[in-house]
Amino acid sequence: MNPIAFHVGNLAIRWYGVIISIGAALGLLLAMYNCKIREASYDEFINMFLIAFPSAIIGARLYYVIFEFEDYRDNLINIFNTRQGGLAIHGGIIFGVLAVYIYLKYRKENFFEYVDVAAPSIILGQAIGRWGNFFNSEAHGGPVTKEFISKFPQFIQKGMFIEGTYYHPTFLYESIWNFIVCIFLVYLLKKTKKKGIVFMAYIGLYSLGRFFIEGLRTDSLYLGSIRVAQLISVLGIILSIFFIYNIIKKEKRY
């Protein structure tokens, strides 16, 4: 796959950045609709986004570099080069959510009211963003047979044929899962007014899909012999179940 979308003068604009930008833009459009459902301020949401998005990019890069520091030890300037990938979504989520929490606390706004609205947009951005991995020929799984890959569209087959070998299109598996979760979260946002349910459902469902898909990947970040993404996913599932249970229990009490 050609990772370059187009050139502006001598500057090569990569598909990776273009696709992330498209995901962010469509996420904002979806948030406009979801703010109306929850009667939340879209202006406040935009302010929140302007803080969360750059924080998430920084967090995603920092998280990746921490676990892959040996690749940057001899050339530290490359830490700042994100154009070819090297963003870990878990780091982005952690830093983005933390930045939003601090901002909304300062603004004296309800944290869960806005992250509930944001959850479908976040997972939509993730679903679209995975296609950036496709154009970078990264985040794929282990080798597969030609017979297996032949079940996929021709352009997927070509993109997953890397250096003479076909690979699992794990980016596609996760993209499809994330789109399904997005649709469910929009539905849930309409059906429940309990603050925190939608956001914690996002954490749990994304983590569930990521846990299984991560097991197929060949480029996982490791902590010893443990895949970091699977460890974080297990914690996310437990956290989600715990919070949703307590939110429902608290509502029943009153």
Curated annotation (Swiss-Prot):
EC number: 2.5.1.145
Molecular function GO labels: phosphatidylglycerol-prolipoprotein diacylglyceryl transferase activity
InterPro entries reported for this sequence: Lgt
Residues noted as binding a 1,2-diacyl-sn-glycero-3-phospho-(1'-sn-glycerol) in the record, renumbered to the chain: R130
Key words, A-Z: Cell membrane, Membrane, Transferase, Transmembrane, Transmembrane helix
Pfam families found in the cross-reference section: LGT
Class in the EC hierarchy, top level: transferase
Localization per Swiss-Prot or TrEMBL: Cell membrane
Biological process per Gene Ontology, one example term: lipoprotein biosynthetic process
Membrane-spanning segments: 11-31, 49-69, 84-104, 169-189, 196-216, 228-248
Protein family per UniProt: Belongs to the Lgt family.
Functional summary from the UniProt entry: Catalyzes the transfer of the diacylglyceryl group from phosphatidylglycerol to the sulfhydryl group of the N-terminal cysteine of a prolipoprotein, the first step in the formation of mature lipoproteins.
Protein name, UniProt field: Phosphatidylglycerol--prolipoprotein diacylglyceryl transferase
